[in-house]
Each structure stands twice: as structure tokens, then as C-alpha cells.
């Protein structure tokens, strides 16, 4: 008799993390593992139609197969545009007057 693959399904919020271990049939997909875990019922705020998922930090489509020991991750949408976040960090560094921040300013204003 073959053993059913065991996978973990995780979803993380800033204040709470969920990690559920489930047994899935051989040949199961990411979608099957998520459905078997019940994570979508635990977190009704997850938009199932726009689900971004991965396996061990690498993006994976919902129909990707899972293997024994995989960790299926459900990703949240970005809150801030990465370019905007970086620009805010640069502006803050410049305001604080660090050498790192000042090197991008014109020479006459350093």
C-alpha cells in the first residue's frame, strides 16, 4: 500500500499565522491541498478567485502537483506598491541625514 503524501498549507496575517498539515491523494494539486486543509473556511477574507500560491516560496499555479513534504503557501496581496515603499525609505534616509541618503543629493546641497 502506498502512503498518501503529507503536505502543509499555510496562510499568514501580521497578527496570526495558520499552518495545517493534511494528507492528500497521490497526484493532488495545490488547489486540492488548499481545499483539504480548510484554510479558506478559517479565513473568509481570502479571495479565492484571485489566489496567489506557491510551494516553498516559489510561485506555483493552482493546478501544480504537490509532493510529499511540500509546504503550500497562500499569498496576500501587496498593501503598498514596492516602488512607492522604496521611495519612502530613501526619502526617510535623506531626511535623517545619513551618508547613505546624502550620496544621491547634488554635491552643492550635501
Curated annotation (Swiss-Prot):
Which classification does the entry list for the species?
A: Bacteria, Pseudomonadati, Pseudomonadota, Betaproteobacteria, Burkholderiales
Q: Which Gene3D superfamilies match?
A: RnfH-like
What domain of life does the native source organism fall in?
A: Bacteria
A Pfam family name for this chain? Ub-RnfH
Belongs to which family?
Answer: Belongs to the UPF0125 (RnfH) family.
Q: What protein is this chain from?
A: Protein RnfH
Provide the residue span(s) of the region labelled Disordered. Answer: 90-110
**PANTHER family noted in UniProt:** UPF0125 PROTEIN RATB
Amino acid at each position: 500500500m502506498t502512503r498518501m503524501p503529507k503536505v502543509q498549507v499555510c496562510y499568514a496575517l501580521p497578527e496570526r499565522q495558520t499552518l495545517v498539515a493534511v494528507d492528500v491523494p497521490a497526484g493532488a494539486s495545490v488547489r486540492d491541498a488548499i481545499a483539504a486543509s480548510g484554510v479558506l473556511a478559517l479565513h473568509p477574507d481570502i479571495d479565492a478567485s484571485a489566489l496567489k500560491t506557491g510551494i516553498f516560496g516559489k510561485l506555483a499555479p493552482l493546478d501544480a502537483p504537490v509532493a510529499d513534504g511540500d509546504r503550500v503557501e497562500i499569498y496576500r496581496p501587496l498593501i503598498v506598491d514596492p516602488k512607492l515603499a522604496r521611495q519612502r525609505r530613501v526619502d526617510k534616509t535623506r531626511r535623517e541625514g545619513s551618508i547613505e541618503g546624502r550620496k544621491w543629493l547634488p554635491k552643492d546641497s550635501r
